[in-house]
Amino acid sequence: MPFSNSHNTLKLRFPAEDEFPDLSGHNNHMAKVLTPELYAELRAKSTPSGFTLDDVIQAGVDNPGHPYIMTVGCVAGDEESYDVFKELFDPIIEDRHGGYKPSDEHKTDLNPDNLQGGDDLDPNYVLSSRVRTGRSIRGFCLPPHCSRGERRAIEKLAVEALSSLDGDLAGRYYALKSMTEAEQQQLIDDHFLFDKPVSPLLLASGMARDWPDARGIWHNDNKTFLVWINEEDHLRVISMQKGGNMKEVFTRFCNGLTQIETLFKSKNYEFMWNPHLGYILTCPSNLGTGLRAGVHIKLPHLGKHEKFPEVLKRLRLQKRGTGGVDTAAVGGVFDVSNADRLGFSEVELVQMVVDGVKLLIEMEQRLEQGQAIDDLVPAQK
């Protein structure tokens, strides 16, 4: 849980080596970067809102990570965290985002006209298409550190802005605390709503405090455009629909996001963004675009093929199970999405998914015929 600065001052009575966490069994980016020397150098610092080094690393201390999956192991508590603790964050960002340097500049492109194709992914294989991102509202602490009042103010602002959306984006807000248990579970099962706060990241970082206060979901009438409020980020914006028309999903995503940003600006609020890190979000893994473009895709043959992991890696894609992170693939259905977030524009990332998915389908069709796929294995993108 985030500590006040007075607690941080109290801890400074002990030498740094007495306060340094035991990271000997850890497999996360934070544990890889944080040395006793770096801890000693940064531990007395705090951001203007009072977020400390121990607040940054606590989630990664409490969750050592997975032997095969490298987790990040740290969070930001406000926009300034990435600057105040840059000696820790910069190497983590470089490691996590494929060598992204502290001097690199991020590019943004939310013009769906720049996407080539994507309206014709074969619906016999692609069951659904989805694009999501996060946004943080400047002037507020991020979820690991925000107070009840801040969280409620974010909810109020977001609901006011979203209620101005019209046309096929028009919809309404559903506060978590006014939903029945059954209604909540139905939305979770249908992949519309975030899960209950059982994830170690949410719990250890303090993001689940006061749950379900000021949390909720806004969606349009046909549930193809959704905004989660006050989960891991202030806002999570999602465009989704059944079938393989990623172009339509991305166009709705860009239009909705642009309208939301305009509505916030009309109330004199802007999203956290800078030229180096792009859009600022709670977890360093989501910096840049914050964008994950994914499809649920049926690959019963390719999914079992020994070359599948290597093909995905070369296409800069990643797979999850049918139910998302840490779940199994059911019936040969995988959730396949872009692996990158930072250093590529939104259009570039969606393009990688569109082009990559077409190749995966071609490979699956070859395997259905009992033919080899060696000649289709791509070079590293």
From Swiss-Prot:
UniProt binding sites for creatine: V72, E232, S285
Residue numbers of Phosphothreonine PTMs: T35, T322
Domain Phosphagen kinase N-terminal as annotated: residue spans: 11-98
GO biological process assignments: phosphocreatine biosynthetic process
Domain Phosphagen kinase C-terminal stretches: 125-367
Composition-biased stretches (Basic and acidic residues): 96-110
GO molecular function: ATP binding; creatine kinase activity
Role noted for this protein: Reversibly catalyzes the transfer of phosphate between ATP and various phosphogens (e.g. creatine phosphate). Creatine kinase isoenzymes play a central role in energy transduction in tissues with large, fluctuating energy demands, such as skeletal muscle, heart, brain and spermatozoa. Acts as a key regulator of adaptive thermogenesis as part of the futile creatine cycle: localizes to the mitochondria of thermogenic fat cells and acts by mediating phosphorylation of creatine to initiate a futile cycle of creatine phosphorylation and dephosphorylation.
Descriptive protein name: Creatine kinase B-type
Organism whose genome encodes this protein: Sus scrofa (Pig)
Lineage: Eukaryota, Metazoa, Chordata, Craniata, Vertebrata
Recorded name of the encoding gene: CKB
